[in-house]
Amino acid sequence: KPDSVLPTLGGQAGLNLAMELEDAGFFKEHNVRLIGTTALTIKKAEDREMFKETMEKIGEPVAPSDIVEDVKHGLEIAEKIGYPVVLRPAYTLGGSGGGIAANPEQCAEILENGLRLSRVGQVLVERCIAGWKEIEYEVMRDGAGNVITVCNMENIDPVGVHTGDSIVVAPSQTLGDKEYQMLRTSALNIISELGITGGCNVQYALNPDSFEYCVIEVNPRVSRSSALASKATGYPIAKVAAKIALGYTLDEIRNAVTKKTYASFEPMLDYCVVKMPRLPFDKFISAKRTLGTQMKATGEVMSICTNFEGALMKAIRSLEQHVDCLLSYDFTDLSDETLEEELNRVDDMRIWRIAEALRRGFTYEQIHDVTKIDFWFIDKLAILVEMEDALKAVGSGEKSLTAELLAEAKRIEYPDNVIARLTGTSQEDIKKLRYDNGIRAVYKMVDTCAAEFAAETPYYYSCFGGFNEAEQTTGRRKVLVLGSGPIRIGQGIEFDFCSVHSTWAFSREGYETIIVNNNPETVSTDFDIADKLYFEPLTPEDVESIVDIEKPDGAVVQFGGQTAIKLTEALMKMGVPILGTAAEDVDAAEDRERFDAILEQCNIPRPAGHTVFTAEEAKEAAHKLGYPVLVRPSYVLGGQGMQIAISDEDIDEFIGIINQIAQEHPILVDKYIMGKEIEVDAICDGTDILIPGIMQHIERTGIHSGDSISVYPAQDITQHNIDTIVDYTEKLARALHVKGMINIQFIVDGDDVYIIEVNPRSSRTVPYISKVTGIPIVPLATRIICGHTIRELGYKPGLQPAADYIAIKMPVFSFEKIRGADISLGPEMKSTGECLGIAKTFNEALYKAFEGAGIRLPKYKKMIMSVRHSDQEEAVDIARRFAAVGYQIFATRGTARTLNKNGVKAYEIRKLEQESPNILDLVLGHQIDLIIDIPAQGAERSHDGFIIRRNAIETGVNVLTSLDTANALVTSLENRAKELTLIDIATVKNA
């Protein structure tokens, strides 16, 4: 029974939950108070009507707008204000359901969606001020009314692109002192009027041609921008906000970086910070790349440099999207007219198009008129393009590469590989020329005070020129921990969990720890996690500069996902020992032939397969194995580019896509076996193996493990299966000489157990299995890397006893945000997050997991089924159970006939190409809860299915594309518990 609740640190979900409890009278009844903010403050900031009234009361301008609660009223208001209009639903996250409408048709569509997604059924319709500058202020206020600004930030993209999808610069670069002070005063007035205690983020639109501005919105909580502002300044916003909520004032809270100043000092920046979004279009080839007021980015990178050009170049190469400079996307085939039109397109490639326009001699005015991007930024991009020209001139023999030119290229952070490519020399030659002329990276501190006071726990960024501030600290052994870079589909926050826990364990073992990472959203980039933090891109050159200065005794790559693994070879060339499993053993697990030899030696079966390089070889392999086959590139994470092929056409299509993503590694073709998928994370000390638990995927093989519902402990496998899995895990861990972690995926087909994949590193299930078994896997693996054994650490080797409850990990998808993406599941990962349901019974755990993932049924009790011919028999039983819990079933012709023939009442609906009312009318009519759509495999897939699934997601209908998921969902509906039991996961710790 808590005394108080702090809702401002849990994002929009925290605020919404606090408001629902407040509205239901729960806090009053239980005598619990909200701290950090009041319910009235949240309402004033989040309720669009109250926000407008509050701003008008203190004379702060807002764009002309009105609140609507139905589509008809919305269209009337839009007419009155005049198109284009911006639509913003109340109480939603990341601009969900919002957008810019240029005409009544678009307006009606966005309104319908926005009203459905808003918790209170409200949408704000306002004048569109797209093209104005978007500026943000991060402000702090304590209970005594003291206020400071922590940081101000500027979006390179003008208003109209969600700040989460925009390139953001801190501090703002294009404001004059008058504008800066005007907005600062406004932000301090707003936070004081709203009565916020803690952190708050205010977003402004500023007219570039006058001093006119208006307030876009206020987040009365710690937000994504707060995380960026914290990392950009070194001022720990969330920590200070929590202390303020407990009653401290700003002048009582010490600055943790300097240990001398207080939180009432405004941070000073003597450097430039750039944030770039990491967008998921590499996973969703069909998605619309345009950016608007709904956020699409899955993550972000941040870089720091003494100049904007350098910070931008660092951010570009931190994205890990095969881009390293402004030449990375090629627009040379566009005519000048087309290029000018394309500058209008707001998407993730826009700065590369601007660079191309500058190469062709477009004037700054031409570019500014179309993009509304400030002249200052266009000029900085021009400086980068001029350097390209200078380096190309060296390549063509017109100039020679002088030390001055090289020093200037490095000052604006041109990496050696790009300089080598443009000048036609080798990277080694460039590096030698640099070193001979003393052109080396030096490291500067982020110390919150522009070097006014000494810093106790600074972090570092590199630049060229000046003196080095990263001093040698202690005489202890040093370990370099490589982070996992930006959050993207397939490599999420799970790897940051591993990096942080391993850093702490190394510290406890007496090591000096050094983290390299570039993601402002993560815990690993907090200044107090490691002894030293370098905020740098994770590329061989950037890491080598750190190694030159720090000279670590070893590096650990098994906790940072594929990002860290990819740096293994480069680290070994630098002479840095890889701690834990040896690099050649990691290679053996990825190299098909070596791995097959190990399996043969251990007498472990795997699905038959071949390694190929061309489409012809792939088809030949598929004919030998017999379709269906699984085709995938080697060395990828998150199943990128993986597909189930059922014909030669599928293979041709697949190889075409692979060639787009520059494939130098071979392609693997495997026989596809339909069975239960099992996953194990284990720790090995070279002799003994510890297996915390066995997880089972609800979806059968063919759906990526990251998109499957995962159950611990595994439910329906035999003791014989379990013994085989444990035996194979032990044999493989020993054969690969694993020291630390290993992740293995199996297929169970009756009594047979096959190996699908082995990764001698941490995996995305590590935090889940650690939390639900109470076994601290990462600290144990780290201590084993340091030389301890499993027995020494007090654990009995082998499979640990299963818990007496069930824990289910449910994937969470963001399909409604990513327009045009196909939502059907397959071997390529698509989920952007996950949640956990824990209970004493399987059914209750499943129900909690579905609820947690936001799948809340039923509302209308109507559903649509469209199942491919081969699965229709299996679908009958599932349909019968949905009918038994009260569902009315509509189905496409073939499915409806099968269901009716088997005694399940189903109403036949017309296909998409038939006249209305057809399946699409039913979906768009807002009467359907659920669609079960099992698409045909491979090239047989119909475009109709894609259109229906997309429209369903965009109108808020739950869509399942796997019968196993449908079976799980109906099971949870059959067993809906009135009262959910609580399980305190902290009590199960074995640690």
Task: Please place each PLM-identified region on the residue numbering.
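ATP-dependent carboxylate activation and anion-phosphoryl transfer catalytic cores
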Residues: 1-2, 13-15, 27, 58-59, ...
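ATP-binding N-terminal substructure of ATP-dependent carboxylate-amine bond-forming enzymes
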Residues: 1-60, 69-76, 314-315, 432-604, ...
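Transmembrane helical cores of multi-pass secondary ion antiporters/exchangers
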Residues: 35, 39, 52, 65, ...
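Short, basic interhelical loop/turn and adjoining N-cap
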Residues: 370-379, 421-433
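Acidic/histidine-enriched active-site and ligand-binding environments that engage anionic O-linkages
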Residues: 76-85, 620-629
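Internal, active-site/partner-interface "lid" segment
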Residues: 33, 66-71, 254-256, 262-274, ...
